[in-house]
């Protein structure tokens, strides 16, 4: 992977944009507007995955991205804000944020730190014995939880490494039938979040 240009944005810029982002199907609702948002380094064993798998090819991309960032003097696991990347072979810039973690109090009173975005990066941190810097969001509206439940056991050994996702595989356990109503639209205030990261080397 070749990074042609990096533009760094501060923690202040990151949080300001997060407060302005909207829901995917309701552009008038801003789930993070009044939440407590901070950058924190949180140990992997304090984070709850909702996604029950990681893709091997995506892990490879994350590792390539980490190495490419290191060549430019940046740490994938400690961005201290966010970066806008121009990648060789990719037409539009891509915004790379720290993983997004949302605090949620479940029905049984358990407080869980759900991984909203950045599962493959968090899993990479797990493999590399790193305590990653994450975006930690607390105080969300109760009616706007993350769209899937966290895995109750919080057991990272249960996460399956896949080449392809089988048709019958349960990727996540959704909270509601129309789960897209609970999607956050990161691209309402950022550029191409989740876009190409390493389709070329």
Protein language model features and the residues they cover:
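Short alpha-helix boundary/capping and kink motifs at helix termini
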Residues: 1-7, 24-40, 44-114, 133
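ADP-ribosyltransferase catalytic core
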Residues: 130-142
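A sequence-level detector for short glycine-anchored, His/Arg-bearing signature motifs
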Residues: 109-128
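A structured, charge-rich N-terminal accessory region that forms the first stable segment of a protein
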Residues: 12, 17-29
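Short, low-complexity, polar/charged sequence segments that are solvent-exposed and flexible
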Residues: 119-123, 134-136, 153-156
């Amino acid at each position: 992977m070749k990074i042609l240009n990096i533009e760094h944005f501060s923690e202040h810029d990151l949080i300001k944009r997060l407060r302005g982002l909207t829901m995917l199907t309701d552009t008038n609702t801003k789930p993070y507007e009044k939440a407590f948002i901070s950058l924190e380094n949180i140990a992997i064993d304090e984070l709850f995955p909702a996604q029950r798998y990681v893709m091997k090819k995506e892990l490879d991309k994350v590792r390539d991205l980490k190495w490419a960032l290191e060549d430019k003097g940046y740490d994938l696991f400690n961005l201290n804000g966010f970066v806008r990347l121009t990648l060789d072979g990719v037409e539009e810039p891509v915004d790379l944020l720290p993983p997004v973690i949302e605090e949620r109090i479940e029905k049984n009173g358990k407080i869980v730190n759900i991984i909203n975005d950045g599962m493959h990066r968090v899993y990479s941190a797990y493999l590399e014995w790193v305590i990653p810097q994450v975006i930690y969001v607390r105080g969300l509206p109760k009616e706007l939880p993350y769209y899937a439940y966290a895995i109750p056991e919080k057991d990272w050994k249960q996460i399956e490494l896949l080449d392809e996702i089988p048709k019958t595989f349960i990727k996540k356990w959704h909270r509601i039938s129309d789960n897209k109503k609970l999607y956050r639209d990161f691209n309402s205030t950022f550029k191409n979040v989740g876009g190409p990261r390493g389709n070329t080397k």
